[in-house]
A protein has these predicted regions:
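Regulatory and interdomain segments flanking nucleotide-handling catalytic cores
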Residues: 1-212
Length: 212
């Protein structure tokens, strides 16, 4: 099993030339950062599109959120949103090139992106075998609700969540020290931004992967 993340930037045609260059540079930066921390392969295409393949699928969900929150918060002068579709399943990477690779995970990821609303993220479970019940309806509801929460973050809130997830969910006191504030303040800000929802969602999706 592999995981394939396909996505594109939201409303990139409305960006100025300078903002578009910043967005693409930022997208490449965060993907290189993710590649440095995982065993993924990525490719940029269609001007504002991207695809990432994770041979180790348990790395995929956290990377998906890391990418999203980086674009929301770490590009100077502009907050960029993206639409994402992450699918699990069989697949074969062709010469380290996601764009020319094939398999269930690639097909399902592409289809899910085509059916996603702008700014939404979707996760597609691998085909269920051995008579087990698919959890896809529950996953769809959770993705819809969490997309709603994340799409309403301010740039400051997204920045805090980016710090939280990119540092592998450190203790709140660590973030407090880094931001020169109190632990209580960080805890309240994380909760109001939906930070307490990320790790349970990641763990849930990875548990389903192990059951497929």
């Amino acid at each position: 099993m592999i995981a394939v993340l396909t996505g594109d930037l939201v409303d990139s045609t409305r960006l100025s030339s300078a903002q578009y260059k910043q967005a693409i540079s930022g997208l490449n930066t965060v993907l290189e950062n993710i590649k440095g921390r995982t065993q993924c392969h990525f490719e940029l295409f269609r001007g504002d599109g991207f695809q990432v393949v994770f041979p180790e699928p348990e790395e995929a969900v956290q990377a998906m959120f890391t990418l999203r929150l980086f674009l929301n918060s770490q590009i100077e002068d502009v907050a960029i949103n993206c639409t994402q579709a992450l699918a699990y399943g069989a697949g074969e990477l062709s010469k380290d090139s996601p764009g020319t690779s094939t398999g269930e995970a690639f097909i399902q990821s592409g289809r899910a992106l085509d059916n996603a609303r702008g700014g939404e993220f979707r996760v597609i479970q691998a085909t269920v075998t051995n008579g087990k019940t698919s959890q896809q309806p529950a996953i769809d509801i959770m993705c819809s609700q969490l997309s709603y929460v994340l799409n309403r973050l301010s740039k400051k809130q997204a920045d805090l969540l980016y710090q939280y997830i990119s540092q592998d969910f450190p203790k709140h006191q660590v973030l407090a020290d880094n931001n020169n504030t109190s632990r209580q303040n960080i805890s309240e800000r994380l909760k109001s931004a939906g930070g307490d929802l990320l790790a349970p969602f990641i763990n849930y999706i990875n548990a389903l992967k192990d059951e497929a």
